Design a protein with these regions (language model features):
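Secreted/periplasmic carbohydrate-active enzymes, especially glycoside hydrolases
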Residues: 1-220
Length: 220
């Protein structure tokens, strides 16, 4: 089973003037100057830092990952003073495997930059490029055999439905890290299993699917 611990409290933020303050996430340093409608809000690099204890896990059968759901716009992540990853793009999730890098007590530092650079587009627009860690940060413990976490921050699962002649075919493609048997179950709104398939490229078929029909029949 997967366990997730949020790292939202007890962060130290070092701003553009070099001063440090305690903050909780989500946080942006443009909360005030980014609201006045002008384009003179501060853009550059600031730093976030927090401490956490290593989670309990079995190194033989489990892995530990850090997950960032949104850091705008570029991020460099350091664990115990060592750079472990960098990410460009403020609107996408990214993760990093840290099992072998953990100590008993750990210091996580994130250098965040919302300045103009040639790696992220658009570089200028009629909206504010808020700088900061504005979505959740999590510590995840997962089995070694798991749905992929390191594939560009996505879920590791692609679902493609096709409807023809009142029947439905659903393709479920899953990226898997490790070994194991992958099973897919499709449930109806009442929790009943209506279709099953096995494998990383599973195909499900429904003879009489109950379709969603807007306000007339909003079935999900």
């Amino acid at each position: 089973m997967r366990s997730i611990a949020k790292l939202m409290q007890n962060w130290q933020f070092t701003g553009p003037d070099g001063s440090t303050a305690a903050v909780v996430l989500p946080h942006t340093w443009n909360a005030k100057d980014g609201q006045d409608g002008g384009n003179d809000y501060w853009r550059g690099t600031c730093t976030y830092s927090t401490a956490f204890a290593a989670p309990a896990f079995d190194a033989a059968s489990q892995q530990v990952w850090l997950q960032f759901e949104g850091v705008n716009s570029s991020a460099k992540v350091l664990l115990n003073g060592r750079t472990i990853c960098a990410h460009d793009g403020g609107y996408s999730t990214f993760r990093v495997h840290i099992s072998e890098l953990l100590e008993k007590d750990n210091r996580l530092t994130v250098e965040v930059d919302n300045g103009i650079n040639d790696r992220i587009y658009p570089q200028k627009a009629d909206f504010t490029f808020y700088g900061g860690i504005y979505r959740d940060v999590s510590l995840m413990v997962v089995p070694k055999d798991h749905i992929a976490l390191g594939h560009f921050g996505d879920t590791g699962v692609k679902i493609t439905p096709a409807l023809k002649d009142g029947k439905a075919d659903i393709r479920v493609e899953t990226l898997v890290e490790g070994e194991g048997v992958l099973s897919v179950e499709l449930l109806d709104a009442a929790g009943n299993i209506v279709a099953t398939a096995d494998g990383a490229d599973a195909k499900l078929h429904l003879e009489t699917p109950h379709l969603w029909d807007g306000v007339k029949d909003p079935y999900l």
